[in-house]
Amino acid sequence: MTKVLMKGNEALAEAAIRAGCRSYFGYPITPQSEVPEYFSRKLPEVGGVFLQAESEIASIYMLYGAAAAGHRTMTSSSGPGISLMQEGISSAAGSDLPMVIVNMMRGGPGLGSIQPSQTDYFQTTRGGGNGDYRVLAYAPSNVQELVDYTILAFDKADEWRMPAFIMADGMLGQMMEPVEFPEANEEVLNRCPKDWATDGRSGERGYRNVITSLELSTPQLEINDRKRYEKYLKIMEEEVIVEEDGVKDCDLILTSYGSAARIVKTAIQILRDEGYKVGLIRPISCLLYTSDAADDMQCGGF
């Protein structure tokens, strides 16, 4: 693999295409506008669909339709746009639909600023819409991780049948760094339709697939929610990705995620050079989990 110097937003979009994403629906907003711009050029070259929606509300429901039909699909936005998508994200979570959503976070609340920020953490990791759901969430700290975890997000969204978020920020989106891309996986690109998808093949199956988040039977809704809760617990056990540095001999643990962790690492090195025993816990997968190192220091979980 050859290294290529790319801006984070464009590298993310290229990674999605190589992961088998063939449909993108979104709306431009700083600091992620290069993502839809890149898709608008590249998706037609691979037979994909790019559509700039009239709003973020429209784009998330276009995503819902593509995911329900079994396609690998993606959208991206920033704080105010992600807020507009919350009803649709809740519907996708309630329908067990895999999709990838990128939040290039900017300052808030409200329209805020276009500067990098991490203020959407709780909105993402605790489910921002109604109904007490969870999503997969990954927080890269450099452009290479932006590539790697975008690809992983598509795989895990399909595996667990749920939305997956990339939690980045304007610094990562606008930063240029050398990255390596894996070769496109032909198995992914030529994947057979998912057996639950509304793909118009009911005659071949002998039954019709219906995708909906509506369940009017209270007992059945309870069953569905319990299944999701059990799934979340399994993910918290099996899908933990965390970087721990210097935690075995430390007196103090600093916690940071995403681009800010780069700065914290430098601060820790300075402190260690001065004789302070300081360690780092960096959550990468940000669905609720506990860290053994944090538990040992009675710090609790994240």
Each language-model region and where it sits:
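Thiamine diphosphate
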Residues: 1-127, 134
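Glycine-/acidic-rich phosphate or pyrophosphate-binding loops and their flanking alpha/beta elements
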Residues: 7-11, 229-253, 265-269
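Short, solvent-exposed amphipathic alpha-helical segments in soluble enzyme
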Residues: 40-42, 90-93, 118, 151-156, ...
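A general structural motif
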Residues: 113-117, 224-240, 255-264, 283-288
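Conserved thiamine diphosphate
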Residues: 116-169
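Conformationally flexible catalytic loops at phosphate/diphosphate-handling active centers
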Residues: 161-244
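Generic long, charged, amphipathic alpha-helical segments
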Residues: 268-288
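Conserved small/polar residues in nucleotide/adenosyl-binding loops
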Residues: 289-294
